């Protein structure tokens, strides 16, 4: 969609899904994944609103850098984006080297997503 509000709504929906999963022991890997999705959609929506451009890709680091360059107050959030970004692929597919996501990591992802969404709202 080229309507930034659609991206913001989907981001909020993903964050709410992550909150429900965390509250009801629905899987820390799914919490981390939905936090990544919320952050990605919020960044894409903000960039669409600000620049008129809908960017491709899933890298939170790339999107955070683009948003910062476009004036978003995210200089201190690049580390959070890099942290949550690591869970995007790792949590989606089975792997021989799979490392489970701890509750602490899931909560850290949740904190990062909430912080980013507050800054860009």
Where are these regions (language model features)?
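Terminal alpha-helical segments
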Residues: 1-121
């Amino acid at each position: 969609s080229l309507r930034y509000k659609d991206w913001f709504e989907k981001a909020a929906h993903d964050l709410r899904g992550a909150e429900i999963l965390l509250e009801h022991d629905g899987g820390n890997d799914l919490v981390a994944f939905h936090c990544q999705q919320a952050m990605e959609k919020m960044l894409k929506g903000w960039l669409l609103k600000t620049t008129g451009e809908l960017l491709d890709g899933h890298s939170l680091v790339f999107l955070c850098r683009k948003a910062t360059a476009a004036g978003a107050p995210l200089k201190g959030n690049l580390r959070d984006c890099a942290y949550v970004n690591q869970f995007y692929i790792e949590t989606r597919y089975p792997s021989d080297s799979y490392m489970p996501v701890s509750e602490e990591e899931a909560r850290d992802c949740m904190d990062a997503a909430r912080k980013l969404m507050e800054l860009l709202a």
